[in-house]
Amino acid sequence: MVLQNLKFHHIGIAVSDFEKIASYYYSIGYKKFNKSIIRDELQVVDLILLIHDFHPNIELVKPLNERSPINNYLKSSDVAIYHFCYEVDSFSDVIKEL
């Protein structure tokens, strides 16, 4: 079964303010994986991947402007769980099994 071999990679968290949220994660031992912010024009977001020696990786996802679909997650709060990401050997095999 393909689904039994899923490997957890990170939690995606939608945020309205990188500095405010990232400072909390830095205070509990998280570090930036990349030196710079990653821009994703397709999703209309900026991304920061945070890593920790013992805790799950976290991807902070911030909308670039009002057209970003991420804004829907931030209507009632400045922070919201956006997604869970898993590593797979074959995306098409996972889709078939679902």
Annotate each PLM feature.
Residues L3-L6, I13-N57, D93-L98:
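Core segments of cupin and vicinal oxygen chelate
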Residues P69, Y73-L98:
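Mid-chain, well-packed structural core segment of small domains
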